[in-house]
Amino acid sequence: MSIERPSCLHRTPMIWAVGFTCLMAAEPLWAQPAAPAGKVQVLSFDIPAGDLSQVLLSIVRQSRTPISFDQARVQGLAGPAIKGSLSVDQALEQALRGSGLGFSRNASGVLTLHTVASQAPQPTTSTPATSAGTLATVVVTGTRQADVKATDSLSPIDVVSNEQLRQTGTQNVREALIKLLPSLSRQAQAYNASALTNAQSLRGLSPNHVLVLVNGKRRHETANINVSGGLQSGSTGVDLDTIPMAAIDHIEVLRDGASAQYGSDAIAGVINIILRTADQGGLVSYNAGQYGAGDGFSQGGAVNNGYRVGETGYLNLSAEFREQKSTIRAGIDERTGHYGNPSIGDPAVHRQALAFNTGAALTDQLDFYSFATYTHRTVSSAQIYQLPTLVPTIYPNGFTPRITSDEDDYSLTAGLRGVELFGDWDWDLSSTYGADKPDIGMDHSVNLALYNETGTTPRKFDLAEYKATQWTNNLDLRRAFDVALLPKPLNFSWGLEQRSDLYKVGAGDYYSYYNGGSKALPGQAPATAGQWTRDVLGGYLDLSTHLTEQWQVATAARYEHYSDFGSTTNGKLSTRYDFNPQVGLRASVSSGFRAPSLAQENYTSLGVSPTIATGLLAANSAAAKMLGAEDLKPEKSINYNLGLVLNPLSDLNIAIDAYQITLRDRIVDGGTYSGQQAIDALRAGGISVPAGLASVSTHYMTNGADTRTHGVDITATYLTRLDGWGQIDWRLGANFNRTKLLKNHIGSDGRPLLNDQQQAWITSSTPRSQVSLEANWSRDKWGLTVRETRYSKTISELDYYTGPNAYSTTEFNHFENSPKYLTDIELRYSATRQLSLAVGANNVFDVKPDKLPAESAYLGFNHYDTYASQISFNGAFYYVNAVYSF
């Protein structure tokens, strides 16, 4: 991989001939194009009889037509031989004859199996959302072939269905995924405005190191950077909560480096969210729940419906709402001797979301497609309680400032997809625009300096307007070549991508930053506001084939040019050898790249508590360079993956994947300074620091570390049939993960950039092991899911707030949070064929993290380690759920 400084620092964005004003069709990924819906094509089939699932996959391979089906629906069914000259529909009709299954085709040619009510045999046991079934799903992530199952992939891929998401008892996509996939984690709680956004980590790395796609198209990042400390500090990852769960068909999580395939950010892996494409039917759902402590009541509802549009079109619509009240998990405030400081807990959230996925065939060889999401979210996050003595004439009983966010998040993709371009090329031309726009405010606060000067102060402030946008244009082409010496076709893909990124910080109102600003969090001053842009041009090549019937290989290369960093070239080589149907070995090696986000380069802030102020200086600012900061550089990575895939029994699937990720020039929270040096730097950066604080410190984002993360992922599924007592779908998931600090970079003043606390955030704030065992039992109308998860200990280096080391930035309190076990239970009942009811409990035994030692519990009330990525401190959560399908 090479980085070259560009001769020109700006390149005008490419203008693509894609001007769409109508709704269009969607498909999981361009690389799986089928013949357009309006075209009838006769093909030659030669498929032997066997399991129906294998017959269906053979139809996919020989016709290059995607077929979406749940393995659980075809489990145990036999498929006939399919031979002769037939259309795809005729072949599928033969395969499904007598099975009780039918099929429908959407506008982009994707075929979906469904039960034919009049023919379907009545099962003696109900069908659960089996993990074994999802393993047989044809996947579209990490491959550009049309017939790859999760169990046959060259890299480890988890497939999570919408039903599995719902059965976690949460309407938050991030929280649902974390419950189901041990390789995903999140920090316990963020502070200040960072608490307003959800983020997730994969394999113990930063949220910045996982790429999120929707239907295979790059998703924009949040505009709200996390600056509250911990592993996720400095991250601007994708907020999955902005995508309505009702719109999701399934989610594919690729646990392997994929920068050579998808570009920047895909260092730890890729999360690809596949939207629903049904042209009929739908559901209405409602869920409600509350924590065992009696707070945090939440409720939500969703509607999804599919419509046929004309002869070949479809429109799938989703709408969703959710409201969540705040929680309080604080200890006794040593200043008052009472409980109730609300700053330790979840914020209050109100959220409304919409999504559509639509399309139609224009001609026999041309399709339109389009999909979009829109989310409006308001959040209110309580900050530290302020004493009555501060402003007695305004708040005689004291006050609790609340940071607020009024956020709009939206994304629209539109494209054209066709076949037989210049002969046999399948092609896809698309444009995606996405934006996140949170307006941050402060309520129930004061400007103390203004109050002392004039005797009056506003109580409500506009702190800042943030905006992050991303406009991505793609041209992708694919063709399969028959090569004489190869047993299967050579799949050749190539494409171009142009992307324009923008990050904007708008100043707050005058009194939000005047002379120290609003209490808890001052607003952005004009000196720290601004707008920054970046343009990216890239191209890729992708080859895959079978060298023998058992040995498949794939290689990819990608070149990208950044207007502000120069050029990068990354590659990936993957291979898999199946010794027999029961044993397979897979491996990959790849290089990766991640450019620093525009927010990491340019964001400045100051957080103020009753006794402490902590600032963040923009890494590229003159103020940060006073302290020795340097311009941020791209992060570079090398990934290795070695996996063993075992299918010893027809109902048992096991995958063991060992991995290593080496990161150079990792962007971390470092370069910490305190006292007058920090105050001078903050003032130079346009930040006014309040007087009378016990401690003032500041830091900046920096390429401060080289790290190596290595570990093992284990997944296993097994189906137990209990004759007349139903069946149990077992799922085991485990992640063993460790990150080592290879190099702590040295600052210009000769000091290491990372102190002990910041090193611990990277190396030990995430559990080194997380193991989950799930049993999903079903019989007739009843279903029961029990999930047990073990989290190993986490280690943090905590601040001292009392004693001789109080507020030190060099001496820390070593703290170990012991291993924890969480138990989740859900009981389901199908009242009718359409109505399903559920009641459940997450963390049924009300397990919480260990409490902090008194000397590190800020003012007594902050008695949990909010930097750890282990378990939530909210405790048991009880819920009910109802789904009506039609």
Question: Where do the language-model regions lie?
Answer:
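Short, acidic, small-residue-rich periplasmic hinge/interaction motif at the N-terminus
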Residues: 56-62, 114-166
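Extracytoplasmic beta-strand/coil segments of soluble accessory domains associated
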Residues: 111-114, 146-147, 157, 177-223
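N-terminal periplasmic accessory domains that precede
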Residues: 111-114, 173-176, 180, 200-201, ...
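Short acidic/polar hinge/loop motifs at secondary-structure boundaries
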Residues: 217-255
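Transmembrane beta-barrel wall of Gram-negative outer-membrane proteins
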Residues: 280-283, 293-383, 388-397, 401-414, ...
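Outer-membrane beta-barrel transmembrane domain signature of Gram-negative proteins
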Residues: 399-413, 420-422, 433, 445-553, ...
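Gram-negative outer-membrane beta-barrel transporters
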Residues: 653, 658-800
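C-terminal beta-signal and adjacent terminal beta-strands/loops
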Residues: 663, 738, 788-802, 829-886
